Amino acid sequence: MKVVVCGASGLIGTALRERLVERGHQVVQLVRREPSGPDQVRWDPARRRLDAGALEGVEAAVNLSGAGVGDQRWTPAYQREVLASRTEPTRTLAEALARLEPRPRVLVQGSAIGVYGHRGEEVLTESSAPGSTFLADVVLDWEAAARPAQDAGIRTAFARTGLVMAPGAGAFGRLLPLLRLGLGGPLGDGRQWWSWITLEDEVSALVHLLETDVDGPVDLTGPAPVRNAELTRALGRAFGRPTLLPVPRLALRAVVGGFADEILASQRVLPTVLQRSGFRFAHEDVDAAARWLADAA
């Protein structure tokens, strides 16, 4: 299958590209610089420029574009970038796919469980209502930007990804250096639910969405969400480091700004649609996930 991938140079995109090639798929990358090979196509999503003709023969697309929500302090300017870096590429790609004849069979569209906002003890699934936080609004706009592909009859699966357990990824990119120094501990009071997924399972789930008939929102999280304190203890056991020192809310805000509110948000998400579609996790519990992360780090 010929698959176009946006965001192929990011953490998840790189791993996905490698997995697709291993499975015998042909991968075309969308890049914003001069292409360095025949497997790359240049585009300019900020100006809505993408030659649909360059995508001739594409049967599927995966869109993972977007600035990392935890990469910088949440200034108003960076919040605008977080939104624009998602909606502009998504709309540009969706419109180009809709113009193709024949049209691709599927678009796997990046999304996030941030759509649910801060929900305390509530158990969340794909049928749960959205929240009212900044990230919830971003995700809703992000998913809406893919509508041209949906309206053209392209099966569209929204991969609502949870907290990806991988070296350098999001919240874990902040947590692991502290853990190695023996300074890792629960964030805030540690009672917030964290819906995690390992990078290995994240990539497998994305491939699964390409190769099955699932559409609509799909939560990409492990089957057993845990409280932050429990996850932190599991990491401590896997890395052989103490996890006794809690990280206060004020300290988090000093380092990451408004992103601290997202780190401390409680989201108890279950991957209902993913499991019903027959997906099998390599890492079903947090201890197995933590051991995998320690080996990968």
Model-derived features: positions:
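N-terminal Rossmann NAD(P)H-binding glycine-rich loop of SDR-like oxidoreductase domains
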Residues: V3-R23
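NAD(P)H-binding glycine-rich loop region in Rossmannoid oxidoreductase-like domains
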Residues: P35, D39-P89
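Conserved Rossmann-fold NAD(P)-dependent oxidoreductase catalytic core, especially the SDR/UDP-sugar
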Residues: E81, R91-T133
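Conserved beta-loop-beta element that borders a ligand/cofactor-binding pocket
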Residues: S111, A144-P167
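Glycine/proline-rich active-site loop of Rossmann-fold NAD(P)-dependent oxidoreductases
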Residues: L140, A152-I154, M165-R174, H208-V218
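Alpha-helical substrate-binding/gating segment
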Residues: L176-G184, Q192-V226
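Mid/C-terminal beta-alpha module of Rossmann-like enzyme folds, strongest
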Residues: E211-G258, R291-A297
